[in-house]
């Protein structure tokens, strides 16, 4: 399976069992996948989560999740929601801090 060369990111389910799923992550990098796997592993219902790349040049990374109970895709969705909220909060904090900084420095520049 050769790595797709499009700029758009997408997902493709490679295999699905009752308690496990493997998903190809097209045009996602290792940093995001490592963070996602770490968050998935915090879930008590998850037995195993990992990502791997068969060949770093020609293959897309794949994420594998096996659960003790529930649906594996639900564990992924929960982790994605948590990370989404985390990054949304981080973005809000940066925005507030930048506004505060600019406001403070505008006042000092005027004085």
Curated annotation (Swiss-Prot):
Membrane-spanning ranges: none
Reactions the enzyme catalyzes: RNA(n) + a ribonucleoside 5'-triphosphate = RNA(n+1) + diphosphate
A single GO BP: DNA-templated transcription
Keywords from the named record: Cytoplasm, DNA-directed RNA polymerase, Nucleotidyltransferase, Transcription, Transferase
Enzyme class label: transferase
EC number: 2.7.7.6
Main location (coarse class): cytoplasm
GO MF annotation list: DNA binding; DNA-directed RNA polymerase activity; protein dimerization activity
Any one cellular-component term (Gene Ontology): DNA-directed RNA polymerase complex
Location relative to the cell: Cytoplasm
Domain of life: Archaea
Pfam families in alphabetical order: RNA_pol_L_2
Subunit structure: Part of the RNA polymerase complex.
Purpose: DNA-dependent RNA polymerase (RNAP) catalyzes the transcription of DNA into RNA using the four ribonucleoside triphosphates as substrates.
Entries under PANTHER family matching the protein: DNA-DIRECTED RNA POLYMERASE I,II,III, DNA-DIRECTED RNA POLYMERASES I AND III SUBUNIT RPAC2
Family: Belongs to the archaeal Rpo11/eukaryotic RPB11/RPC19 RNA polymerase subunit family.
Protein name: DNA-directed RNA polymerase subunit Rpo11
Provenance organism: Thermoplasma acidophilum (strain ATCC 25905 / DSM 1728 / JCM 9062 / NBRC 15155 / AMRC-C165)
């Amino acid at each position: 399976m050769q790595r797709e060369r499009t700029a758009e990111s997408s997902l493709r389910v490679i295999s699905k069992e009752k308690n496990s799923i493997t998903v190809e992550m097209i045009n996602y990098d290792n940093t995001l996948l490592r963070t996602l796997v770490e968050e998935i592993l915090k879930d008590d219902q998850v037995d195993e989560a990992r990502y791997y790349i068969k060949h770093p040049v020609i293959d897309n990374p794949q994420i594998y999740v096996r659960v003790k109970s529930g649906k594996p895709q639900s564990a992924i969705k929960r982790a994605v929601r948590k990370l989404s909220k985390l990054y949304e909060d981080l973005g809000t904090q940066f925005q507030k801090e930048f506004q505060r900084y600019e406001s403070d420095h505008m006042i000092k520049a005027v004085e």
